[in-house]
Amino acid sequence: MTLILGIDPGSRITGFGVVRQTARGCEYVASGCIRTGGGELHERLQIVFRGVSEIIRQHGPVTMGIERVFMARNADSALKLGQARGAAIVAAAEAGLEIAEYSASQVKQAVAGTGGANKEQVMMMVMHLLKLTQKPQIDASDALAIALCHAHTRSSLIPHGLATARRRGGRLRL
């Protein structure tokens, strides 16, 4: 049994999802959103860092999947998103978690079967795979999808890939 944390980073809303990977598949543990409000950027990044640190403390995951930054039309938004990712990655690294990064299309492919799936399709598959009866918040759904993608990818990489990544500093880029 392995606890996996998925993070959908954002400078205003960061989604999180925790799943338990067992021999029979994945089970839902927890999900939600870290809301940073409208303060200064450094204050919002601190909230993301502390929020992710608290989730790790509460649930005890051993590995984390996080979405990669995509280059948006607005460079300022992409920069802020990258900084929020950094805050979450540092929180996970401080706790000793293995960290893997996934593109949005990789997550969609792993969960919905196509890299072009929309958010609603991804959410429906997350609900089906984790046997959820209520729709999670959209950012939490995305984070659960990232956790499921990471669980699927870990299953195909173990033992070689993650052991190699651990020797190289704990960061696995897929």
Curated annotation (Swiss-Prot):
> Per the record, GO CC terms?
cytoplasm; Holliday junction resolvase complex
Co-factor: note: Binds 2 Mg(2+) ion per subunit.
Binding locations of Mg(2+) 1: 8, 139
Q: Which organism is it from?
A: Pseudomonas entomophila (strain L48)
EC id: 3.1.21.10
| Designated name of the protein | Crossover junction endodeoxyribonuclease RuvC
Binding partners and assembly: Homodimer which binds Holliday junction (HJ) DNA. The HJ becomes 2-fold symmetrical on binding to RuvC with unstacked arms; it has a different conformation from HJ DNA in complex with RuvA. In the full resolvosome a probable DNA-RuvA(4)-RuvB(12)-RuvC(2) complex forms which resolves the HJ.
Q: By which gene is this protein encoded? A: ruvC
Q: Mind giving the lineage of the organism this protein is from?
A: Bacteria, Pseudomonadati, Pseudomonadota, Gammaproteobacteria, Pseudomonadales
Q: What class of enzyme is it?
A: hydrolase
